[in-house]
A protein has these predicted regions:
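Accessory nucleic acid-recognition modules appended to NTPase machines
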Residues: 1-91
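Conserved nucleotide-binding/hydrolysis micro-motifs of P-loop NTPases
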Residues: 3-5, 113-114, 146-148
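Short conserved micro-motifs at the rims of enzyme active sites and ligand-binding pockets
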Residues: 26-28, 109, 151-154
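Conserved catalytic cores of phosphodiester-cleaving nucleases, focusing on short active-site segments
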Residues: 68, 94-118, 125-127, 139
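Short helix-loop-beta junction
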Residues: 69-77, 102-105, 131-132
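Long, low-complexity, charge-rich intrinsically disordered regions
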Residues: 111, 131-132, 144
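Short, charged, amphipathic alpha-helix that recurs within catalytic cores of restriction-modification
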Residues: 118-139, 150-154
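Domain-level recognition of nuclease-like catalytic cores that cleave nucleotide substrates
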Residues: 140-169
């Protein structure tokens, strides 16, 4: 993205794109010997269950991006989006940045594992936007759990915010 915040950006992030291969190398391959010794539910309880929530966090962000892309295809975004991705900084991240051809931005914050998406998390998003030198008139807040009541009330009166929970996804 053409954000201007290069001094705060990490050089690059490499990830295995194929979800099956990623799962295999994260959970199965490192414990192959135990795979043959343990019963399936024992293997799952020992090696997969404790880390599954953290592992799925990344994929929740992907689902949120896909949701925004679908809204874009249906013409339901605040403006047409040309590209979508993430910003990874040295001291913080922006989960989703959707950008138009004239470089207007929509940012997204994805909450997978916290009990609720809070105004403090939004404040951290604003700080990361400053580091990335990104301005946005619209903010999409995604939560797998719930939203802080004060934040939900604020979003009802401020049309810059769009709150999306698991039921909408």
């Amino acid at each position: 993205f053409q954000t201007g915040g290069w001094e705060n950006t990490k050089k690059g992030v490499y990830q295995i794109k194929d979800t099956f291969i990623n799962f295999w190398f994260k959970f199965v391959f490192p414990h192959m010997s135990d795979l043959y010794l343990l019963k399936p539910h024992e293997f799952y309880d020992r090696y997969i269950a404790p880390e599954l929530g953290t592992y799925l966090k990344r994929y929740f962000r992907n689902v949120c991006m896909e949701y925004m892309m679908l809204l874009n295809q249906m013409g339901r975004m605040p403006f047409p989006v040309h590209k979508i991705g993430t910003w990874v900084g040295k001291t913080g991240n922006i989960d989703i940045i959707a950008q138009s051809t004239d470089r207007r931005n929509i940012v997204g914050l994805c909450n997978w594992d916290q009990p609720q998406l809070t105004s403090q998390m939004c404040e951290e998003l604003y700080q990361n936007m400053e580091k990335a030198k990104i301005r946005s008139e619209h903010i999409f807040l995604f939560s797998a759990t719930r939203f802080e009541p004060m934040l939900a009330e604020h979003a009802k009166t401020d049309d810059r915010f769009e709150l999306i929970d698991m039921n909408e996804l």
